[in-house]
């Protein structure tokens, strides 16, 4: 098979079989980025080519067809252009969130890859990620594992986020903003938080980043 030409639509509804691979076996990957208005009025986004590369790796891991990086970037750019009126103004702290995603769309009964897929991009205006401004948050070392050794922690798959829901709800119930996850094999090494990579700065100003095959590479 091959990808069709695609196109722009204002319809935000997706109609698929109730047996679709995405519904029955969580066969979906996604990316996330933002479009900003600069001080001089230009609309920009940061390195969508890297998001395209990451989605290629994610798709391959879940036995999904690779959506070419150049087409990924073009789809993102065209979608942002079509929604330029919804990009918040410079200085507002708000942005246009851009969500490219891919999923198995045809009926699948039996654990196997789907044979048909959809790649889509939608956008929505969002406020500042840190509602009260950039300030320290409370983090706990979680008793839960985010990813298994040799598992899917290094890709941006929907199933990883479903697995983290209980942990973040539990953290909030206990008065914490976020979880810090340790490596699940030895539980002695810091990996990442639920929503971001983790960076350490030593006393002499050196930046240290965790290295693990179960951490989602940042962009």
Give the ranges of each region predicted by the language model.
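Short, charge-rich binding segments
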Residues: 85-91, 111-113
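Helix-start/capping segments and mature chain N-termini
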Residues: 1-79, 108-219
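Intrinsically disordered, low-complexity linker/loop segments enriched in Gly/Pro
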Residues: 82, 104-105
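Extended, Lys/Arg-enriched charged tracts that mediate electrostatic binding to polyanionic substrates
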Residues: 88-99, 103
């Amino acid at each position: 098979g091959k990808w069709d030409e695609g196109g722009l639509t204002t319809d935000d509804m997706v109609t698929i079989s109730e047996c679709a691979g995405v519904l029955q076996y969580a066969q979906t990957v996604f990316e996330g980025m933002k479009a900003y208005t600069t001080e001089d009025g230009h609309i920009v986004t940061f390195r969508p080519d890297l998001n395209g590369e990451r989605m290629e790796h994610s798709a391959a891991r879940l036995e999904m067809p690779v959506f070419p990086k150049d087409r990924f970037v073009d789809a993102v750019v065209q979608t942002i252009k079509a929604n330029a009126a919804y990009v918040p103004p410079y200085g507002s702290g708000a942005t246009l969130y851009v969500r490219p995603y891919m999923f198995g769309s045809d009926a699948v009964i039996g654990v196997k890859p789907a044979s048909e897929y959809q790649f889509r991009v939608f956008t929505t205006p969002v406020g500042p990620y840190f509602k009260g401004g950039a300030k320290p948050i409370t983090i706990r070392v979680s008793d839960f594992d985010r990813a298994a050794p040799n598992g899917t922690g290094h890709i941006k798959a929907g199933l990883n986020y479903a697995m983290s829901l209980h942990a973040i709800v539990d953290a909030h119930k206990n008065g914490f903003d976020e979880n810090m996850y340790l490596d699940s094999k030895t539980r002695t090494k810091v990996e990442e938080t639920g929503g971001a990579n983790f960076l350490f700065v030593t006393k002499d100003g050196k930046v240290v980043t965790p290295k693990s095959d179960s951490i989602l590479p940042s962009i």
